[in-house]
C-alpha cells in the first residue's frame, strides 16, 4: 500500500494508476487531482470529503467489510448484527484501524480501509465462538447414559487381596450392545483407564477427569485387617469417588466416544493395567517426567496475546488455593463432629449409670430418658459427620484434583506455543544460514538449505495451527468445566443443607419429647 508522509496530501503524492484501470478513469484522474488521491474505490469514499460522504455505499464495500468485522472480534464475543448500516460501517472502520495497529501500520483510518482487499478479507481468521454458542453446544451434548458402582467385594487374602466393584451401565445409545449391562472392575482398572485417556486427550487440551487418589493405609487395613467401621467407611468413600469419576468421564462427549471407555464399560475381562503402582518402574518414570515438566514450565515465559487465558489461569490458581484451605477446614469440622459424637455417647452412658443409682423415682426416670435422648443425639452427630465428609469434603477433594488438571491444560497450551516459537527461531536460523551461503557463493549447499527452510516453514505453519486448535479446545473445556462445577456445587450444597435441616428438626423433636419428663420431676 502506498502511503505518503504524515503531512502530505493526496494531491502531492499520486500513486501510479493500476494496470487494469481504463482510460476514462485515467482521464478523470488528470482532470480532478483531489478525487484521484487513490485509485481504490474504497479510498475514494474516504478522501473525497463532504461530497463523497453523501454518496451511497456500493454492495462491493459491504461484502468486503463483513468478513473483516467478524474476523476482528476477540475472545469469542459477537455483537448483534441488527444494527443500522451506518453503525456497521463506523464499527468496521474502528475494527480495521485496530487491525492495522496490530500490524504496526501507523496510518489513517481511511487508508486502513484501502489496505484490505476483498480477497484478504475472505482470508481473515475465523471468529471465536461466543460463550452462548458454547453453552448451546454443551446443552446438545447431553447423553442418556448412567453408570453406577456397587457391591465392593474383597477377593483373595493377605497382601495379594484386592477389591472388585460392580460397574452397571444403563443407556439407550446405539453404540452399546444393550441397554443395561454390568462388569467387574478393580481399582487399578480405573487408573489404567485414566492413563489411556490422558495420554490421548490431554496433549490436545482436553480436561480428563482424574480418578480418586490411592490410599496405601486404607487399602492395607482392608487387605490384612478385620472388617470394621473404618474399613467400611473407606470402601464406601472409594466406591462413591469412583462412581463420580466414571460419571464425569461418560458425561464428556469426547471421552464417551473413546473406544477405551466403551471397552471399560462393556468388556467382561480387561488386561491387567501396568504402571499404575506408585513404586513401579512406570510410576517412577511418571514422577520424573512431572518434575521435568515443572522445571521446564518455570523456564517458559509466554507472551500471552489473549488476556482471557491469562485472567482465567489466575482465577484457577487462586480457586485451587482457596479450595485447599476450605477442604482443610471441613476435614477439621468432620473430626470435631466425630469427637462430639464420641463424647455425647460417653455422656449418655454416664447419665444412664447415674439414673440407675438414683433413689428418686421421677429423677431416675428423667435421667434415664435423658440418656436415651443423648444416645439419639450421638447418632445424629455421627450421621452429620458422615454427611460433612461425603457431601462437602469429598466434593472439595474432587475439584482440587480437577483444578490441577485444568492447570495442566493451560500448561499444555503453553508447551504448544513454545514449540511454535522454537520452530520460528529455527526457521530464522535456517534463513540466516542460507543468506551466508549466498554471500559465500556456495551453490552446492544452497539447495539443501532451501529444502530445510521449506521443511521448517511447513512446521511453523503446522505448529501455529496446533496452537490455535488447542487454544480453542482449552477455552471450550474451561467453559464446560465451570458450568459443570456450578451444577455440581449447587446439587451437593442443596443436599448438605437438607441434611442439616433434617438433623436440626430431629434434634428439636427429641428435646420436645423429653420436656414433659423433665417437668415431671418432683
From Swiss-Prot:
<feature type="modified residue" description="Phosphoserine">
    <location>
        <position position="39"/>
    </location>
</feature>
<keyword id="KW-0653">Protein transport</keyword>
<dbReference type="GO" id="GO:0005769">
    <property type="term" value="C:early endosome"/>
</dbReference>
<feature type="domain" description="BAR">
    <location>
        <begin position="302"/>
        <end position="522"/>
    </location>
</feature>
<comment type="subunit">
    <text>Predominantly forms heterodimers with BAR domain-containing sorting nexins SNX5, SNX6 and SNX32. Can self-associate to form homodimers. The heterodimers are proposed to self-assemble into helical arrays on the membrane to stabilize and expand local membrane curvature underlying endosomal tubule formation.</text>
</comment>
<keyword id="KW-0597">Phosphoprotein</keyword>
<dbReference type="InterPro" id="IPR001683">
    <property type="entry name" value="PX_dom"/>
</dbReference>
<feature type="compositionally biased region" description="Polar residues">
    <location>
        <begin position="55"/>
        <end position="65"/>
    </location>
</feature>
<feature type="binding site">
    <location>
        <position position="186"/>
    </location>
    <ligand>
        <name>a 1,2-diacyl-sn-glycero-3-phospho-(1D-myo-inositol-3-phosphate)</name>
    </ligand>
</feature>
<feature type="region of interest" description="Disordered">
    <location>
        <begin position="1"/>
        <end position="144"/>
    </location>
</feature>
<dbReference type="InterPro" id="IPR034901">
    <property type="entry name" value="PX_SNX1"/>
</dbReference>
<dbReference type="InterPro" id="IPR015404">
    <property type="entry name" value="Vps5_C"/>
</dbReference>
<dbReference type="GO" id="GO:0030027">
    <property type="term" value="C:lamellipodium"/>
</dbReference>
<feature type="modified residue" description="Phosphoserine">
    <location>
        <position position="58"/>
    </location>
</feature>
<dbReference type="InterPro" id="IPR036871">
    <property type="entry name" value="PX_dom_sf"/>
</dbReference>
<dbReference type="InterPro" id="IPR028660">
    <property type="entry name" value="SNX1_BAR"/>
</dbReference>
<dbReference type="Pfam" id="PF00787">
    <property type="entry name" value="PX"/>
</dbReference>
<dbReference type="Pfam" id="PF03700">
    <property type="entry name" value="Sorting_nexin"/>
</dbReference>
<feature type="modified residue" description="Phosphoserine">
    <location>
        <position position="72"/>
    </location>
</feature>
<feature type="compositionally biased region" description="Basic and acidic residues">
    <location>
        <begin position="71"/>
        <end position="80"/>
    </location>
</feature>
<dbReference type="GO" id="GO:0098999">
    <property type="term" value="C:extrinsic component of postsynaptic endosome membrane"/>
</dbReference>
<feature type="modified residue" description="Phosphoserine">
    <location>
        <position position="32"/>
    </location>
</feature>
<dbReference type="GO" id="GO:0031901">
    <property type="term" value="C:early endosome membrane"/>
</dbReference>
<dbReference type="GO" id="GO:0005794">
    <property type="term" value="C:Golgi apparatus"/>
</dbReference>
<dbReference type="InterPro" id="IPR005329">
    <property type="entry name" value="Sorting_nexin_N"/>
</dbReference>
<dbReference type="GO" id="GO:0098793">
    <property type="term" value="C:presynapse"/>
</dbReference>
<dbReference type="InterPro" id="IPR027267">
    <property type="entry name" value="AH/BAR_dom_sf"/>
</dbReference>
<keyword id="KW-0333">Golgi apparatus</keyword>
<comment type="similarity">
    <text>Belongs to the sorting nexin family.</text>
</comment>
<dbReference type="GO" id="GO:0030512">
    <property type="term" value="P:negative regulation of transforming growth factor beta receptor signaling pathway"/>
</dbReference>
<feature type="modified residue" description="N6-acetyllysine">
    <location>
        <position position="237"/>
    </location>
</feature>
<keyword id="KW-0446">Lipid-binding</keyword>
<feature type="modified residue" description="Phosphothreonine">
    <location>
        <position position="41"/>
    </location>
</feature>
<dbReference type="GO" id="GO:0043197">
    <property type="term" value="C:dendritic spine"/>
</dbReference>
<dbReference type="GO" id="GO:0031175">
    <property type="term" value="P:neuron projection development"/>
</dbReference>
<feature type="modified residue" description="Phosphoserine">
    <location>
        <position position="280"/>
    </location>
</feature>
<feature type="compositionally biased region" description="Acidic residues">
    <location>
        <begin position="132"/>
        <end position="143"/>
    </location>
</feature>
<comment type="function">
    <text>Involved in several stages of intracellular trafficking. Interacts with membranes containing phosphatidylinositol 3-phosphate (PtdIns(3P)) or phosphatidylinositol 3,5-bisphosphate (PtdIns(3,5)P2). Acts in part as component of the retromer membrane-deforming SNX-BAR subcomplex. The SNX-BAR retromer mediates retrograde transport of cargo proteins from endosomes to the trans-Golgi network (TGN) and is involved in endosome-to-plasma membrane transport for cargo protein recycling.</text>
</comment>
<feature type="region of interest" description="Membrane-binding amphipathic helix">
    <location>
        <begin position="281"/>
        <end position="298"/>
    </location>
</feature>
<dbReference type="GO" id="GO:0016020">
    <property type="term" value="C:membrane"/>
</dbReference>
<dbReference type="GO" id="GO:0035091">
    <property type="term" value="F:phosphatidylinositol binding"/>
</dbReference>
<keyword id="KW-0007">Acetylation</keyword>
Amino acid at each position: 500500500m502506498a502511503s505518503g508522509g504524515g503531512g502530505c496530501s493526496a494531491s502531492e503524492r499520486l500513486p501510479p494508476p493500476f494496470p487494469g484501470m481504463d482510460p476514462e478513469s485515467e482521464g478523470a484522474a488528470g482532470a480532478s487531482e483531489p478525487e484521484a488521491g487513490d485509485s481504490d474505490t474504497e479510498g475514494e469514499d474516504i478522501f473525497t470529503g463532504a461530497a463523497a460522504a453523501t454518496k451511497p455505499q456500493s454492495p462491493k464495500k459491504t461484502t468486503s467489510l463483513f468478513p473483516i468485522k467478524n474476523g476482528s472480534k476477540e475472545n469469542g464475543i459477537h455483537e448483534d448484527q441488527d444494527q443500522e448500516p451506518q453503525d456497521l460501517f463506523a464499527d468496521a472502520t474502528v475494527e480495521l484501524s485496530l487491525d492495522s495497529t496490530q500490524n504496526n501500520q501507523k496510518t489513517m483510518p481511511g487508508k486502513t480501509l484501502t489496505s484490505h482487499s476483498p480477497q484478504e478479507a475472505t482470508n481473515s481468521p475465523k471468529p471465536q465462538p461466543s460463550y452462548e454458542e458454547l453453552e448451546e453446544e454443551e446443552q446438545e451434548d447431553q447423553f442418556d447414559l448412567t453408570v453406577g458402582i456397587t457391591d465392593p467385594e474383597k477377593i483373595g487374602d493377605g497382601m495379594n487381596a484386592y477389591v472388585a466393584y460392580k460397574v452397571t451401565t444403563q443407556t439407550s445409545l446405539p453404540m452399546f450392545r444393550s441397554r443395561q449391562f454390568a462388569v467387574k472392575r478393580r481399582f487399578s482398572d480405573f487408573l489404567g483407564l485414566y492413563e489411556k485417556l490422558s495420554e490421548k486427550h490431554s496433549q490436545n487440551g482436553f480436561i480428563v477427569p482424574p480418578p480418586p487418589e490411592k490410599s496405601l493405609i486404607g487399602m492395607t487395613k482392608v487387605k490384612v485387617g478385620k472388617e470394621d467401621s473404618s474399613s467400611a467407611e473407606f470402601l464406601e468413600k472409594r466406591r462413591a469417588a469412583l462412581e463420580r469419576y466414571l460419571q464425569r468421564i461418560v458425561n464428556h462427549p469426547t471421552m464417551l466416544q473413546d473406544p477405551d471407555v466403551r471397552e471399560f464399560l462393556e468388556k467382561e475381562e480387561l488386561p491387567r493395567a501396568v504402571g499404575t503402582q506408585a513404586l513401579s518402574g512406570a510410576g517412577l518414570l511418571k514422577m520424573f517426567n512431572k518434575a521435568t515438566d515443572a522445571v521446564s514450565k518455570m523456564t517458559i515465559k509466554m507472551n500471552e496475546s489473549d488476556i482471557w487465558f491469562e485472567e482465567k489461569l489466575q482465577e484457577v490458581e487462586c480457586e485451587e488455593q482457596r479450595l485447599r484451605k476450605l477442604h482443610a477446614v471441613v476435614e477439621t469440622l468432620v473430626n470435631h463432629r466425630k469427637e462430639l459424637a464420641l463424647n455425647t455417647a460417653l455422656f449418655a452412658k454416664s447419665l444412664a449409670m447415674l439414673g440407675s443409682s438414683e433413689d428418686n423415682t421421677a429423677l431416675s426416670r428423667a435421667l434415664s430418658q435423658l440418656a436415651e435422648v443423648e444416645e439419639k443425639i450421638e447418632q445424629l452427630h455421627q450421621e452429620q459427620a458422615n454427611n460433612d465428609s461425603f457431601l462437602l469434603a469429598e466434593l472439595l477433594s474432587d475439584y482440587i484434583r480437577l483444578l490441577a488438571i485444568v492447570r495442566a491444560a493451560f500448561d499444555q497450551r503453553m508447551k504448544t506455543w513454545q514449540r511454535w516459537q522454537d520452530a520460528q527461531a529455527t526457521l530464522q536460523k535456517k534463513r540466516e544460514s542460507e543468506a551466508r551461503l549466498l554471500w559465500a557463493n556456495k551453490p552446492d549447499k544452497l539447495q539443501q538449505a532451501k529444502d530445510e527452510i521449506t521443511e521448517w516453514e511447513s512446521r511453523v505453519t503446522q505448529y501455529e495451527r496446533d496452537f490455535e486448535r488447542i487454544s480453542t479446545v482449552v477455552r471450550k473445556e474451561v467453559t464446560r468445566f465451570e458450568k459443570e462445577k456450578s451444577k455440581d456445587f449447587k446439587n451437593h450444597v442443596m443436599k448438605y443443607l437438607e441434611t442439616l435441616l433434617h438433623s436440626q428438626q430431629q434434634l428439636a423433636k427429641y428435646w420436645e419429647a423429653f420436656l414433659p419428663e423433665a417437668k415431671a420431676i418432683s
